[in-house]
A protein has these predicted regions:
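Acetyl-CoA-dependent GNAT
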Residues: 11-74, 79, 92, 98, ...
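A short, internal acetyl-CoA/4′-phosphopantetheine-binding micro-motif in the GNAT/acyltransferase core
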Residues: 76-83, 112
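Conserved GNAT acetyl-CoA-binding A-motif
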Residues: 99-112
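Conserved acetyl-CoA-binding loop-helix of GNAT-fold acetyltransferases
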Residues: 84-97, 123
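Conserved N-terminal entry element of GNAT/NAT acetyltransferase domains
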Residues: 1-19, 147-157
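Conserved catalytic-core motifs of GNAT/GCN5-like acyltransferases
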Residues: 108-110, 127-143
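Conserved acetyl-CoA-binding loop of GNAT-fold acetyltransferases
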Residues: 2, 122-131
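Short acidic/glycine-enriched loop/turn segments that link adjacent beta-strands
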Residues: 46, 115-116, 135-140
Length: 157
C-alpha cells in the first residue's frame, strides 16, 4: 500500500491509441532524453526507401527509417532471379547514403544468422553487435551495426 492519500492508478488495455498518448510520449521522452543524453533527440521517423528496377519490374528494395540519428534497415530483398549480381550491395549502399543525408551516423539491422548473411553484411562494413539465440521460429538472429555510416561514394549506382 502506498502512503495515505496517494492517487490510485488504474491500468487498462485499450483498442486504439488515444491522441493523448502521442503527446505524453513526446513530452516524457524529451525529459528522459535530456536526463540520459543531455540533449533533446528528434524521434520523428523519416522513411528511407531505395528501389531497384529493371524497366518497370521491381527487382529489389531496401526499406527502413532514420530516427534520432540512427538508421534502421528493416527490409532488404532482391528478387530471386536477380540475386548474386551485386544488386543487394548497391541497395544497401544507397540506403546508407540516403540515411546519412537524413542525419544518421550509424545503421542497425537484424537478420537471420547464416554464413551468407554474415559474409554479405561484413563485406558492406557491418559488424556483429549481438547474437539472439532462437529469436524467430527457433532460428538465431544477429544484430549488425555499421559505423561510420557515410562512405566516399555518394552517387546513384
Amino acid at each position: 500500500m502506498g502512503p495515505e492519500g496517494a492517487d490510485v492508478i488504474a491500468c487498462r488495455v485499450v483498442e486504439a491509441e488515444p491522441p493523448e498518448v502521442r503527446e505524453f510520449l513526446a513530452r516524457e521522452w524529451a525529459l528522459a532524453d535530456r536526463g540520459l543524453f543531455g540533449a533533446d533527440l528528434d524521434w520523428t521517423s523519416r522513411p528511407v526507401v531505395v528501389e531497384a528496377r529493371a524497366g518497370r519490374e521491381l527487382a529489389g528494395v531496401a526499406l527502413g527509417e532514420v530516427v534520432a540519428g540512427m538508421a534502421r534497415l528493416h527490409d532488404l530483398l532482391v528478387a530471386e532471379r536477380r540475386r548474386g549480381r551485386g544488386l543487394g550491395g548497391r541497395l544497401v549502399e544507397l540506403f546508407c547514403v540516403r540515411a546519412a543525408d537524413l542525419g544518421a551516423a550509424r545503421c542497425f539491422l537484424r537478420c537471420p544468422d547464416t554464413p551468407r548473411h554474415r559474409s554479405f553484411y561484413e563485406r558492406h562494413g557491418f559488424t556483429t553487435i549481438a547474437v539472439l539465440p532462437r529469436y524467430y521460429h527457433g532460428h538465431d538472429f544477429v544484430e549488425y551495426l555499421r559505423e561510420p555510416l557515410a562512405q566516399e561514394d555518394r552517387g546513384e549506382r
